[in-house]
Amino acid sequence: KTVIVIEHHSEFIAEYCDEMVLVSDGGVAWKEPAQVGLNRLNDLRAENIHPPQVTQIADAVPAGMATVSDGRYPVTVDEAETALWAESAPPGEQRSVPTEGATEPESHSHSREKDAENGDREPVITLRNVGHGYPTLREGYNQVLDGLNLDLYAGDRVALVGANGSGKSTLLRLLTGLESPDEGTVSVLGQETNDALPEELADDTVYIHQNPEEMFVEDTVRKDIGYYLKNRGAADVESRVEEILTYLDLEALADRDGRLMSVGQQRRASLGIGLATDPTVVLLDEPTGSLDLQSRREVTGILRKAESHVETVVIASHDLQLVAGWADRVIVLNEGDVLADAPPAAVFDDAELLAAADLRQPQVVALSDRLGFDTPVLTTDAMVEAITNKTASDATPAVGDGAAPDTGIPNTTQTLGEEQ
C-alpha cells in the first residue's frame, strides 16, 4: 500500500514518511528521501515551511557540531541525540547540563500555586461546575465539558490544548456568551454570561474565529475594522482605524478585500479587527492553524504586541511549539475534564500526561530530556543558546592548563552541500 499525506508539519514527515515531494508554483520542485528533503533548508524556508526543530538547532549551533554520519543535519530526536552527544558520556550514563533560560517543571496542580500567587485578587474569568454538551443522532447527548472549575487572572497567557473533541472550542464559545452552559456558571469580569447578551459581553471580550474569513463583511480591511468599531459605539473611528493599522503593521492590507486574501493575511487582519476596541479579554481559536512559517511569525508577533493592551489572552491550539514558546499557563483538556493546569515546562516534560491527552512532545523538549538537561528547554533559541554557552564554557582552559577540556561534543568537520 502507498500512503500519501499533505503536511506542513515537518516533524511528522521526519518520523513517518519515507519520501518527500516539494510542490511549488503548481508543480513538483523535487522529490527526495525524507531525511534529505528536510535538509534542503533554503528550499523549505523559501516556501515558508518549518524544518524540524532539531534540524533548526543543528543549523544554528557552531558549524560541524551537529551532523550525522552522512554529513547532513539530524531530522529526528534520535538522530539529534546521537549527533550532539555521541561522545559525551559512557554508555548508559546521562550527562546533567544546567540550562540557563530553561524553566523548572512545576506541579500539574497549577490552581493551588496560582491562588497563592494571586492572593486576594479577583479572577477575570471564573467557571464553576460547568457542564456542556450537544445532542447527537447516534449517542443522544455528547458531554463535552463535565464539572469544569477554572479561575483565569489578569496577565495570564493561557493555552487550551487537547485532542479534537476535548472541549477547547466549546470552552471559548461559553466565555463569549454565544453558548450557555447546560450546568454551572461562567463569569467574565464579574458578570455571569447567562445574565448578559453576547453583544454586551463583546464590549470587553473579543472572540477571534478559527475560520478568519467569517470576520470580514466589507470590501476592505480598513472598512471592516471601522465597521466593528462603529457597531461597538466607539468614538473617533477613523483615527482609531489608522492607529490599529499602524500598530499591527497592517497598512499593506488596509485596502484589500479580506475575503480574497490568503489565510495568513486573513488571520493577521482578523486580529486587527478583534483588537481594535482595546478589549480586556481576547479569545483565539487556532490562531496559527494552517499557516506557513512567515504567517505564523507575523501572527505570533501580533499576539506579543497584544499583551501590553489586553489583560488576559486565551488561545485554543494544536500548535504545541507556539504554546511552549508563548503561554505561561497550559490547560490540558481531555474528555471534558482538566488533566493538567500548569506552566508549559511541567506539561511538556510529562510524557505520560501527553500520551493520555494524545499530544506530541515538542522535539526540543524531548531532546533536552535525552541530553540530560536539568530542566526542560521549550524553544529552539533557548536550546541553541544553552548548547553554545556550554560548548564555550567547556572549551575555556582552566588557569595554568594549556589545553581546553573535552567538550563532550563530536568535533565533526563534515559540512552540508550547496543545496542547503
Can you say where each PLM-predicted feature lies in the sequence?
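Catalytic Walker B motif of ABC-type/P-loop ATPase nucleotide-binding domains
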Residues: 282-285
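Conserved ABC transporter NBD signature motif
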Residues: 184-192, 201-202
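Helix-to-loop junction immediately C-terminal to a conserved catalytic motif
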Residues: 176
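ABC ATPase nucleotide-binding domains
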Residues: 44-123, 354-420
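Conserved ABC ATPase "signature" region
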Residues: 235-253
